[in-house]
A protein has these predicted regions:
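Extended, folded cores of ATP/NTP-driven motor/assembly subunits in large transport
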Residues: 1-230
Length: 231
């Protein structure tokens, strides 16, 4: 559902000023008459930052991002993360890649893998080891790259660059650390890796909030089908 300006500001107000939700009032005419800025009503009274968390007013918050994910993810993972009984936000930023550019990228990646395998086999042959089996990690890289290329060329999938971020809040640092470990454990259960943004908490917060900015580098490659799990 599309939000108007007042509803968007209410979302930000309720995040920045938890416990003061009922006090939200947006009257632009009255603000202009008094010479007030709407930001004064939205922003917290103070902001403090450290390497791995922020303090907004009296609340602590921490921004996490999905650092790595499994080749297959159940759609229940996002549900488990967001069902956690805490004030939080989850954001998914996606940039589609043109199909011709995506195919070229995957073909180059596959060519690099095949070259590595060929060089490895040559080294084994030079040592008279003619029956050596290609290492599992190389074989897996080749298999996944071929499947990715097949998705793009025959299954009409699109290649996407994505970053998934989430912010959680707590009353104190101890609770924040405990909640963070709980969320990291949920991700590990699904063979994914959530991580804390180090020295990028403000950039992460500006990325996860619904204000249309992205300050974090896109670090994940996915197809439309695999990305749909997070929607």
């Amino acid at each position: 559902t599309e939000l108007d300006a007042a509803e968007k500001l209410r979302v930000l107000h309720d995040f920045y000023r938890q416990g003061e939700e009922a006090a939200f009032l947006f009257d632009p005419q009255d603000m202009m008459r008094k010479g007030h800025d709407f930001k004064d009503y939205i922003c917290p009274d103070s902001m403090e930052k450290s390497s791995d968390c922020l303090k907004l007013g009296e609340k602590y918050c921490r921004v996490l991002f999905l650092k790595d994910y499994a080749s297959y993810i159940k759609d229940s993972m996002v549900t488990e993360l967001t069902d956690f009984n805490r004030n939080m936000m989850l954001s998914i930023d996606v940039v589609p890649i043109p199909t011709d550019e995506a195919v070229r990228e995957v073909e180059n990646r596959l060519l690099g893998i095949e070259t590595n395998i060929t060089n490895w086999q040559r080294r084994q042959n030079a040592n008279n080891n003619f029956s050596a089996v290609v290492p599992y990690d190389m074989e897996l890289q080749r298999k996944e790259s071929k499947e990715f290329l097949d998705d793009l060329t025959t299954r009409d999938q699109r290649m996407m660059l994505a970053v998934i971020t989430m912010v959680i809040t707590a009353d104190d640092k101890k609770q924040l650390d405990s909640d963070t470990e709980t969320l990291l454990a949920v991700a590990r259960k699904h063979m994914c890796q959530l991580a804390v943004l180090k020295f990028q908490q403000f950039d992460g917060l500006n990325t996860v909030l619904p204000i249309g900015t992205r300050r974090i580098i896109l670090n994940g490659t996915a197809t439309t089908e695999s990305l749909a799990v997070f929607m």
